[in-house]
C-alpha cells in the first residue's frame, strides 16, 4: 500500500484534497500535517512514499521542508503544490530537491482524471527539471 503525506495549512483545502484523493485512489494510506514541524514528526512515524506540500506554510515553507526531507529521506518523492505557479518558485522548488512542482488547479485536475486503479507516480506531466 502506497503512503502519502499531505502538508497544507488551509484545513478546508486539506480536507477537500484528502477526500478527493481517497475517492479516486482508495488504496492509498493518507496522513496529513498542517505545518513543517508536524510534517517532520509524521515523516518519522509514517514513512510516506510521497509527500504533497504547499509552498507557503506557517513558520517555515515547503522549500525548507523539502530540503529537510531530501536530506534525511532522499528516496521520498516530494511534490510541491501551490497557487503560486511562477518560474522563480518552480526553479526554487527544484533547487530545494522537489521532484515535481504543480499548481493546485492542475493537481486537482490530475487527481480527478485518475481512476482507482492508477498510481500517482504514473503521471509524469511535470517531471523534475521541466521548465
Go through the PLM ranges and name each one.
Residues 8:
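Conserved acidic carboxylate
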Residues 63-74:
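Short amphipathic alpha-helix used as the core "switch/output" element in two-component signaling
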Residues 35, 61-64:
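Acidic catalytic/metal-coordinating carboxylates
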Residues 58, 86:
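The feature encodes the CheY-like receiver
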Residues 54:
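Active-site residues of response regulator receiver
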Residues 32-50:
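Acidic, metal-coordinating helix/loop segments flanking the phosphotransfer/catalytic sites
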Amino acid at each position: 500500500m502506497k503512503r502519502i503525506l499531505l502538508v497544507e495549512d488551509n484545513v478546508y483545502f486539506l480536507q477537500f484534497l484528502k477526500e478527493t484523493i481517497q475517492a479516486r485512489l482508495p488504496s492509498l494510506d493518507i496522513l496529513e500535517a498542517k505545518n513543517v514541524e508536524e510534517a517532520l514528526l509524521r515523516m518519522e512515524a509514517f514513512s510516506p512514499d510521497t509527500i504533497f506540500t504547499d509552498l507557503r506554510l506557517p513558520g517555515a515553507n515547503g522549500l525548507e521542508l523539502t530540503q529537510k526531507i531530501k536530506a534525511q529521506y532522499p528516496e521520498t518523492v516530494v511534490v510541491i503544490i501551490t497557487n503560486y505557479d511562477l518560474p522563480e518558485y518552480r526553479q526554487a522548488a527544484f533547487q530545494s530537491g522537489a521532484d515535481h512542482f504543480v499548481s493546485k488547479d492542475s493537481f486537482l485536475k490530475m487527481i480527478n482524471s485518475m481512476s482507482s486503479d492508477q498510481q500517482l507516480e504514473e503521471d509524469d506531466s511535470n517531471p523534475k527539471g521541466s521548465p
